[in-house]
């Protein structure tokens, strides 16, 4: 604890230093906090290089039109949710309201005088003519199913329109486009829940909008872009805490602003609008994108963080073709999450490389109603980088906005104070990053010491001399671990159990591999005190390389985390001599392949007189199903633990008494079953007859490749141990597998259901294959529904 405590004290001192530096920089630059920036102009929140900034919208479109939404003020004494008063932003020499009205009314003819004798008022509505224009009022409850239809020439004369108590009126689209002289609009206590973006586009004379007590959840600022509005009433609507509504809190009276509330997305709770934080608003922004290649499954993982409001839609283009929308199994979107009320989306796109050698262009796109963002990258489909490929944020091109939402130039987006603040924030981020990196280094060093202590307790003891009478042969093959430990969310908290050397007695050699030999032996006090247990002892040559020793350590640590009824029990390790040992459960009937052959239709030609009792006959279908169910159960467990076996076959399964079958490979099968392995293009010996196309081509092993191997193992069991593709050479087998050919159905004992499981394991696309969980369930159903056959011919 001395080291971590000293580091914490050092970190506190550095944090104080960072704060003092930041204070001096801020005071020297004369900066004010972001909250004190001028708010006279409409603003939206944007994200640039991961730093949230408030951008003042000064685009040319907004300067040249007086129909700006302006800065929003709450009249003193009125609740903010009740009335929002807006004032237009005009040039200094203009009178607010007059000049803008002249501009917006240019080219618009208002027919203020209407001949009522030729005008038919809409049913259930009242129409009155005044000196200023027509007033239309529809207040009889639930009499309108749609917006009242008024002739175009009459609509131009309407200055006031009232709709109240119309619960069936749910949307507002383009029904108001001819009401060009409308000044006061009231839609109150209706069922209105949706307003289209162009609903108010032509209402350039509109002064007040009353939308009280409707069902609106969002009211975008874009609805008022073409208006010179003075009052907006939104009381009684269930406005959500979203970026779309964030502009409503941009008011000048802080006391009234604090009273405005919004509902969360679930509608259960409410919060003050001033407390709601919506970091990213506006056009989609690809804030971060990382491309990672995973050798274990031969796939690229494209991880992204994208912001935008409304929530952007994600797609991936490959050579200008949409691959996510098309539903292609070679491209899948996983881990898709949304944060900040749906305004930040994260996810991973899985890319399975194609059999191509030319460069392929990919484009990640994010689209919403405000615009689109693209990021392009290139891949050679046969490229297999050794480490992650990071695409830095600085390489991401500018956003591409839509035509309806123009972007200002960088000089127009940022005020002088913001330009000063950004470098300051950058300096702060650099300092914090430095402190964080130092903390990670110290933490990694602490973990390394802890691991070394564990290894020292396990492997670095001083030992007595131990000599075994049987010499070990030279290293013949480079042996790969038959189980592959993938990255897991948890780390084993205990070291493998240590077995004392004096409790082990080696009896005879039962196998040999590249690492050394496997002995039949006994071990005292292993399972119970004062009792001997028969065990299998896997030894490591004393003169082996450091890499084999590291593999031995990793395998021991991995095996210590596995515990299943159909996996050979790992008891522990012994490192008290030059010959390191692993102690396993002993399975008296040997490997499953030999057992199947000795209990199959050709057993009479294979067995020796003394090797087996004469009364043991051929295995029945029920016994074969019992065998495959046990293998499936073990593989289902490994898949759930994220372990990849990589060499599943009957030769690597062991048989005990009462037909108990367990997974257990001591690495000796490559010497015993030499014809099952083939050296491909100078690589290590590979079991190509059990491997799927992606493993042969890309040398990648995944849980899906284990599923393929299980299908071949299933075929082995129901053919009583025959070698897959026994009629072809290894090179011919590779061509058959690449061309999507599969093994023929085994005769007699294999049911239709079992063969369908085999076919489900041999799908060319890994994502289309059955999972081990599905396989286990299908086989259990096959057993429960399998009729019992009686041999009446014999």
From Swiss-Prot:
Expression is confined to the central nervous system and its associated endocrine tissues. Residues 441-794 are cytoplasmic. Residues 36-102 are annotated as: Disordered. LRR repeats lie at residues 181-202, 205-226. Gene3D superfamilies: Immunoglobulins, Phosphorylase Kinase, domain 1, Ribonuclease Inhibitor, Transferase(Phosphotransferase) domain 1. Pfam families: LRR_8, PK_Tyr_Ser-Thr. It catalyses: L-tyrosyl-[protein] + ATP = O-phospho-L-tyrosyl-[protein] + ADP + H(+). One of its GO terms (cellular component) is receptor complex. The modification Phosphotyrosine is found at residues 673, 677-678, 789. It is found in: Membrane. ATP binds at residues 510-518, 538. CDD domains: PTKc_Trk. The keyword Transport does not apply. Residues 34-419 are extracellular. The active site is at 647 (proton acceptor). Keywords: ATP-binding, Developmental protein, Differentiation, Glycoprotein, Kinase, Leucine-rich repeat, Membrane, Neurogenesis, Nucleotide-binding, Phosphoprotein, Receptor, Repeat, Signal, Transferase, Transmembrane, Transmembrane helix, Tyrosine-protein kinase. Residues 237-280 form the LRRCT domain. SUPFAM superfamilies: L domain-like, Protein kinase-like (PK-like). Glycans are attached at residues 64, 102, 128, 288, 374. GO terms for molecular function: ATP binding; neurotrophin binding; neurotrophin receptor activity; transmembrane receptor protein tyrosine kinase activity. It is an enzyme of class 2 (transferase). May bind an endogenous invertebrate neurotrophin. Binds human NT-3, but not NGF or BDNF. Belongs to the protein kinase superfamily. Tyr protein kinase family. Insulin receptor subfamily. This is Putative neurotrophin receptor LTRK 1. It comes from Lymnaea stagnalis (Great pond snail).
């Amino acid at each position: 604890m001395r080291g971590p405590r000293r580091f914490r004290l050092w970190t506190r001192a550095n944090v104080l230093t960072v704060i003092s530096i930041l204070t001096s920089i801020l005071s020297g630059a004369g900066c004010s906090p972001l909250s004190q920036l001028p708010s006279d102009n409409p603003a939206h929140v944007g994200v640039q290089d991961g730093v949230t900034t408030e951008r003042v919208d000064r685009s040319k479109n907004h300067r040249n039109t007086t129909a700006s939404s302006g800065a929003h003020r709450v009249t003193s004494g009125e609740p903010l949710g009740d009335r929002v008063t807006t004032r237009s932003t005009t040039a200094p020499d203009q009178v607010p309201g007059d000049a803008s009205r002249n501009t917006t009314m240019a080219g618009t003819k208002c027919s203020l005088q209407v001949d009522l004798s030729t005008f038919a008022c809409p049913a259930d509505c009242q129409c009155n003519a005044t000196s200023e224009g027509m007033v239309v009022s529809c207040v009889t409850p639930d009499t309108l199913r749609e917006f009242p239809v008024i002739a175009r020439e009459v609509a131009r004369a309407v200055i006031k329109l009232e709709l109240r108590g119309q619960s069936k009126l749910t949307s507002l689209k383009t029904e108001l486009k001819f009401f060009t002289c409308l000044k006061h609009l009231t839609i109150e206590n209706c069922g209105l829940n949706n307003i289209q973006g162009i609903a108010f586009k032509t209402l350039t004379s509109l002064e007040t909008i009353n939308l009280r007590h409707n069902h609106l959840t969002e009211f975008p600022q874009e609805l008022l872009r073409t208006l010179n509005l003075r009052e907006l009433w939104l009381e009684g609507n269930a406005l959500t805490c979203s970026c779309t509504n964030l502009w409503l809190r941009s008011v000048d009276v802080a006391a009234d602003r604090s009273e405005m509330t919004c509902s969360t997305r679930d509608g259960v709770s409410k919060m003050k609008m001033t407390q709601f934080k919506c970091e990213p608003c506006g056009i989609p922004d690809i804030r971060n994108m990382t491309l990672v290649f995973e050798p274990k499954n031969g796939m690229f993982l494209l991880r992204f963080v994208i912001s935008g409001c409304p929530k952007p839609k994600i797609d991936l283009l490959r050579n200008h073709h949409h691959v996510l929308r098309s539903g292609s199994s070679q491209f899948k979107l996983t881990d898709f999450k949304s944060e900040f009320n749906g305004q930040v989306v994260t996810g991973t796109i899985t890319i399975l490389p194609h059999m191509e050698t030319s460069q392929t262009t990919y484009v990640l796109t994010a689209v919403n109603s405000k615009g689109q963002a693209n990021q392009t990258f290139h891949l050679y489909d046969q490229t297999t980088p050794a480490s992650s490929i990071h695409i830095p944020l600085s390489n991401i091109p500018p956003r591409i906005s839509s035509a309806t939402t123009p972007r200002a130039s960088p000089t127009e987006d940022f005020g002088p104070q913001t330009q000063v603040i950004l470098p300051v924030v950058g300096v702060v981020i650099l300092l914090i990053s430095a402190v964080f990196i130092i903390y990670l280094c110290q933490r990694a060093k602490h973990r390394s010491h802890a691991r070394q202590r564990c290894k020292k307790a396990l492997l670095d003891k001083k030992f007595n001399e131990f000599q075994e009478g049987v010499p070990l042969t030279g290293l013949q093959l480079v042996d790969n671990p038959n189980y592959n430990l993938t990255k897991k969310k948890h780390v084993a908290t205990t070291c493998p159990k240590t077995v004392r050397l004096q409790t082990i007695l080696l009896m005879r050699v039962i196998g040999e591999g590249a690492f050394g030999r496997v002995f039949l032996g006994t071990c005292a006090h292993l399972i119970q005190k004062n009792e001997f247990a028969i065990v299998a002892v896997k030894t490591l040559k004393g003169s082996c390389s450091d890499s084999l020793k590291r593999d031995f350590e990793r395998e021991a640590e991995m095996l210590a985390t596995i515990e299943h009824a159909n996996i050979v029990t790992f008891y522990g390790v012994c490192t008290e001599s030059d010959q390191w040992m692993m102690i396993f459960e002993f399975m008296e009937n040997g490997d499953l392949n030999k057992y199947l052959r000795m209990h199959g239709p050709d057993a009479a030609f294979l067995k020796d007189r003394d090797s087996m009792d004469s009364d043991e006959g051929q295995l029945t279908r029920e016994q074969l199903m019992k065998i495959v169910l046990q293998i499936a159960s073990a593989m289902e467990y490994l898949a759930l633990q994220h372990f990849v076996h990589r060499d599943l076959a009957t030769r690597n399964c062991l048989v005990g008494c009462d037909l108990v079958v367990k997974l257990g490979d001591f690495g000796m099968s490559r010497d015993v079953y030499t014809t099952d392995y083939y050296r491909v293009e100078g690589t290590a010996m590979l079991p190509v007859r059990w491997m799927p196309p992606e493993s042969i081509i890309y040398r990648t092993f995944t849980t899906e490749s284990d599923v393929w191997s299980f299908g071949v193992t299933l075929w082995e069991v129901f053919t009583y141990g025959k070698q897959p593709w026994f009629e072809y050479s290894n090179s011919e087998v590779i061509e058959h597998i690449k061309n999507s050919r599969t093994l023929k159905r085994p005769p007699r004992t294999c049911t239709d259901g079992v063969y369908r499981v085999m076919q489900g394991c041999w799908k060319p696309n890994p994502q289309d294959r059955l999972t081990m969980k599905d396989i286990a369930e299908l086989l259990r159903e096959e057993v429960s529904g399998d009729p019992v056959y009686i041999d009446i011919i014999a």
